[in-house]
Amino acid sequence: MISVKDVVNYNPEEYKFKSREIPSDLLAIIIYAYMQKVKDLGSDTTLYEIGYEVGRLVSPKSYEDIKKFFEANNIGYIEIKEKDNGEVEIKVKDCIFCRTQKSEEPMCDFEAGLIAGFLESIKNKKYFVKEMYCQAQGYDACVFIAKPLHN
């Protein structure tokens, strides 16, 4: 049986974003339209779950891998800070999905799931990630808090 990972065939060492093939602004518009359609159907959870699965498939080994993935794919520039209580704070500047949008609420459910999948791959434990602040709300960055889940 072929796995999704085989189909994706992602290799971080060889992967390069081909911005000439799909301009990042066009990709952002396409993804935004998709996200809005899913939200209109009342399923923010679906976006989170899709992001989570993508994060697990990419399977980074370090925070540096996450930073490289975000930058190589023009998603944004990130800062990652571990807190004493076990939480992880992730700040995404110049977020491709919301930097040109306006919203009263945080809107980056896909990225929250993506970060949860990334952290699970790195730390070997599950996290729940919530976006606290979003560029679409007028903040200078999207800020996510990742809380470890206890079994």
UniProtKB/Swiss-Prot annotation:
SUPFAM superfamilies: Ligand-binding domain in the NO signalling and Golgi transport (SSF111126). Pfam families: DUF2507, V4R. PANTHER family: ARSR FAMILY TRANSCRIPTIONAL REGULATOR (PTHR35090:SF2), DNA-DIRECTED RNA POLYMERASE SUBUNIT I (PTHR35090). Belongs to the M.jannaschii MJ0150/MJ0739/MJ0745/MJ1460/MJ1642 family. This is Uncharacterized protein MJ0739. It comes from Methanocaldococcus jannaschii (strain ATCC 43067 / DSM 2661 / JAL-1 / JCM 10045 / NBRC 100440). The lineage of its organism: Archaea, Methanobacteriati, Methanobacteriota, Methanomada group, Methanococci.
